[in-house]
């Protein structure tokens, strides 16, 4: 039987989703808005003669045909028709100066492709979609083909860009050209080129050649871009539908200018010189509708930016972008035609288009969690662009030196981050802004499903069109953890707590320490921030992470065979900007984090510069192998079967690092670190399925099989419990919780909602009330039911019905339960963070019918119950005797259970 078991598991592993070799419509990224795939329709074969009939010339379309072996013949059977139209039905558009309507319609059948677009840019976007559908066939030696489909697509936001800081670093012109080619495939349409900095001036100024002389640069001496190179790059970008926005930062970040020229930018000499420079910039970038003039992080003299903006507008006929906020001035229309919001303080300027860059600084990102945050976030609180919200730009600031230009791309995870950001901008939406949604990947639900869809598509392209690029990101949506509540360590990172000393073969879900129960929480993802760098502006896994705490995380990894693998492991992501301190020799970080595989500790890497000060803006000193993106993967060996991964995460004295990040990264890869290992199962409950166990803090619904009675209280007043007195009466919370009037069941209505029923009198909490008014009890069943929704605090839930939301009031309202809602009374728009709306639940009692059918046991597998938990060497699933699936690893109460293994079913009785 043992042989049979593992044969089955190997087969199951082979059936897991894998990257197919050839592209399908389901691989298009960004995800198109409207897709209709006809059934049984034949594809359009490439690598043949085609007739191109076009109202709009398009270099990108011609390049696509040539790349895929198509030759033009006006009499060919296969035809491609490009038609200019006045509008695309159903597409969204808004006015943004210098940015065209990009909507298109694409229809593919066996011998005909029809492209409809309002502008030439729309044709380019259609060609980029065709390029993706044809992807992957060359690797298999097959003739590329295009799946039959009808697509209507458009961008929700018109600015979807990336910024490279080449003033502090340097990227070759070939690297930039490659980025434009590859990013444009994903409809990224703006390249913000930050050309000048305090470390170096990279734009050739023929009037002032000393600016680019090696002796006037601090880092990457002598490296700059000639005007001819810039002109060629802009022309190439335009063919791909990419707009370049060159930036000459003024008057700050200008040390090189001041040193070389001998005067400050805001002096009269400086202003005159800048106008000469801007004139050369405009001549070099004839297609650039905007010139970025910076303006931030320095005290501005009155009228300086206004004078420069006026010159750009009136003398050069271009529009002006400035950073937002400025140090000592408010942005106004005299100094800017567009703003780029770069911090929490950067807010939308009414009457101007604004680019959201506030939390999109990849130099601070880890590889996994921050990508989740930026993908699932809306863009500046809105789901589609308008005249005041232009879009987003993903920016990389390289204040800290890295070894190579490839390190800049890899350590900032730029391909994954930029494509995720641009995908959100094209698709629109995002359930919540990152200030509310944070960077934690939900375990289930719409946001999780949306992210998995993105991840699968991105990884397909990583394996094909992006296969040569330095992309550290691998699949993470199947990586599951349990993370404990933080234990108090009193500043001692070495202090040991119960999870670390437990000898259970399956770790518990609750631990008692000094009379206090510490819960565990289910988590998903290869990277988790217990405390984000921008906490509490950006929420973290812990709602209130504090100093001098220790948390633990663990999972069990099922491997169908013994195998050597790699692992990406990290406990502190060093930002690519800011002064820092290297990790201590022999330790993973400066906090004392540790990790074990199968109870064997995994040693820390050999650091190239342990305990060393790493200064930003230094000419020589920079990052080496501190981040896992700059190291080979850790070599590990997985046993056949379950492998325990256990992590200790102290947070003592902020870790002695410049930034307070409390985090971890772990995922198993191939030995090269390029891809996730197929067929592995990450389960902290040793479940062989990818099922997510129900949150143990979420109350169970009562039904005919079992009745569950709960007391509940709010985060605001945890000592007060709602009580029912009589029908039609308000529900008042008191400190009394020993009587049946404070106990409630959540009775399943069978429609995804429930009734809230009091144990003492059978009264219901009625949802019929007005906004900001008391809730009352009812003797009759309500017409509609309540629902649980996760609150902002892990382990807490809100209770909602339509546009009603239960709130625990204060003494001024007599501690009554009120209908709070969100004020707007829009269904689904609930308060997740109000302490009075967040509730926790304590189970008082569960009652079950006395008649229980006796299950049969068809096996005698080695199954025991030790300390109230199932212990077996075999993978198993746990069920109640009535067949309901139960969380694996739970503490069993008195009763009977069925343990299902591959060797059969075993009944166990707990007395």
Where are these regions (language model features)?
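Acidic, contiguous N-terminal accessory segments
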Residues: 11-15, 21-155, 322-327, 333-337, ...
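Active-site neighborhood of glycoside hydrolase catalytic domains
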Residues: 257-338, 342-349
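Beta-strand-rich ligand-recognition modules
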Residues: 579-664
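C-terminal outer-membrane/trafficking sorting elements
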Residues: 853-911
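Flexible, acidic glycine-rich loops studded with aromatic residues
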Residues: 333-335, 343-478
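Lectin-like carbohydrate-binding module/patch detector with strong preference for beta-trefoil
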Residues: 692-849
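Accessory carbohydrate-binding/adhesion or oligomerization-edge regions at the termini
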Residues: 453-543, 576, 607, 644-693, ...
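Feature activates predominantly on carbohydrate-active enzymes
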Residues: 99-290, 307, 623, 645
């Amino acid at each position: 039987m043992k042989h049979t078991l593992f044969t089955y598991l190997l087969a199951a592993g082979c059936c897991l989703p894998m990257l197919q070799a050839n592209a399908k419509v389901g691989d298009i990224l960004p995800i198109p808005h409207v897709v209709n795939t006809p059934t049984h329709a034949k594809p359009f074969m490439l690598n043949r003669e085609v007739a191109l009939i076009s109202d709009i010339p398009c270099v990108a379309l011609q390049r696509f045909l040539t790349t895929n072996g198509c030759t033009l013949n006006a009499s060919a059977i296969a035809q491609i028709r490009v038609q200019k139209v006045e509008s695309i039905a159903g597409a969204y558009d808004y006015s943004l100066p210098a940015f065209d309507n990009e909507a298109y319609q694409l229809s593919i059948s066996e011998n005909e492709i029809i492209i409809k677009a309002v502008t030439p840019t729309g044709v380019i976007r259609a060609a980029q979609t065709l390029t993706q559908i044809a992807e992957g066939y060359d690797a298999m030696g097959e003739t590329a083909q295009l799946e039959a489909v009808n697509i209507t697509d458009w961008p929700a936001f018109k600015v979807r860009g990336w910024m490279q800081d080449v003033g502090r670093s340097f990227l070759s012109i070939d690297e930039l050209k490659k980025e434009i080619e590859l990013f444009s495939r994903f409809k990224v349409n703006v390249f913000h080129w930050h050309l000048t900095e305090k470390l170096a001036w990279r734009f050739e100024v023929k009037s002032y050649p000393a600016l680019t002389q090696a002796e006037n640069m601090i880092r990457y001496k002598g490296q700059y871009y000639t005007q001819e190179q810039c002109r060629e790059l802009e022309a190439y970008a335009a063919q791909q539908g990419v707009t370049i926005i060159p930036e000459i930062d003024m008057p700050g970040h200008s040390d090189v200018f001041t040193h070389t020229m001998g005067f400050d930018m805001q002096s009269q000499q400086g202003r005159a010189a800048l106008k000469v420079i801007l004139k050369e910039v405009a001549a070099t970038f004839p297609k650039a509708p905007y010139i970025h003039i910076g303006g931030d992080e320095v005290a501005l003299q009155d009228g300086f930016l206004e004078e420069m903006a006026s010159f750009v507008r009136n003398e050069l006929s271009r529009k002006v972008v400035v950073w937002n906020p400025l140090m000592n001035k408010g942005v106004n229309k005299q100094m800017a035609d567009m703003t780029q919001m770069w911090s929490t303080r950067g807010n939308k300027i009414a009457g101007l288009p604004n680019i959201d860059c506030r939390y999109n600084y990849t130099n601070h990102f880890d590889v996994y969690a921050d990508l989740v945050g930026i993908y699932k976030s809306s863009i500046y609180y809105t789901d589609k662009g308008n005249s005041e919200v232009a879009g987003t730009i993903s920016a990389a600031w390289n204040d800290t030196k890295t070894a190579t230009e490839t390190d800049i791309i890899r350590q900032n995870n730029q391909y994954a981050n930029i494509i995720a950001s641009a995908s959100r901008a094209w698709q629109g939406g995002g359930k919540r802004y990152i200030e509310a949604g944070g960077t934690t990947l939900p375990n289930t639900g719409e946001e999780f499903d949306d992210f998995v869809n993105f991840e699968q598509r991105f990884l397909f392209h990583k394996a094909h069109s992006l296969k040569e690029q330095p992309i550290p990101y691998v699949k993470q949506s199947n990586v599951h953890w349990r993370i404990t509540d933080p234990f108090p360590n009193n500043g001692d990172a070495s202090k040991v707590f119960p999870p670390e000393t437990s000898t259970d073969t399956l770790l518990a879900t609750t631990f008692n320490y000094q009379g206090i129960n510490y819960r565990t929480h289910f988590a998903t993802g290869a990277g988790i921030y217990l405390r984000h760098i921008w906490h509490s502006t950006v929420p973290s896994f812990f709602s209130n992470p504090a100093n001098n705490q220790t948390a633990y995380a663990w999972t069990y990894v099922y491997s169908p065979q013994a195998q050597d693998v790699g692992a990406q492991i990290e406990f502190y992501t060093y930002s690519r900007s800011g002064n820092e301190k290297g990790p201590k020799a022999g330790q993973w970080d400066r906090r004392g984090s540790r990790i074990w595989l199968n109870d064997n500790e995994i040693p820390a890497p050999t650091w190239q510069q342990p305990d060393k000060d790493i200064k930003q803006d230094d000419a020589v000193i920079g990052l080496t192998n501190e981040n896992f993106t700059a190291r080979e993967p850790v070599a590990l060996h997985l046993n056949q079967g379950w492998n325990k991964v256990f992590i200790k995460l102290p947070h003592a004295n902020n870790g002695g690092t410049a930034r307070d990040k409390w985090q971890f990264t772990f995922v198993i890869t191939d030995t090269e670190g390029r891809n996730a290992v197929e067929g592995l199962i990450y389960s902290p409950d040793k479940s062989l399925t990818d099922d997510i166990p129900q949150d143990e803090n979420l109350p169970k619904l009562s039904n005919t099989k079992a009745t569950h009675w709960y007391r509940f209280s709010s985060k605001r007043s945890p000592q007060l419990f709602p009580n029912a007195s009589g029908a039609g009466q308000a529900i008042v919370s008191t400190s009394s919780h020993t009587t049946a009037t404070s106990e409630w069941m959540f009775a399943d209505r069978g429609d995804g909602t429930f009734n809230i029923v009091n144990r003492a009198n059978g009264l219901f909490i009625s949802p019929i009330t007005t906004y900001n008014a008391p809730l009352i009890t009812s003797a009759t069943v309500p017409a509609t039911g309540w629902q649980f929704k996760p609150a902002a605090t892990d382990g807490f839930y809100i209770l909602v019905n339509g546009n009603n939301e239960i709130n625990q009031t204060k003494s001024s309202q007599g501690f009554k339960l009120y209908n709070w809602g969100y004020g707007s009374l829009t269904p689904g728009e609930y308060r997740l963070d109000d302490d009075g709306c967040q509730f926790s639940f304590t189970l008082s009692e569960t009652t079950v019918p006395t008649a229980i059918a006796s299950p049969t046991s068809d096996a005698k597998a080695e199954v025991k119950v030790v300390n109230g938990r199932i212990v077996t060497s075999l993978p198993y699933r746990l069920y109640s005797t009535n067949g309901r699936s139960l969380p694996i690893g739970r503490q069993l109460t008195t009763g009977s259970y069925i343990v299902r293994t591959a060797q059969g079913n075993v009944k166990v009785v707990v007395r």
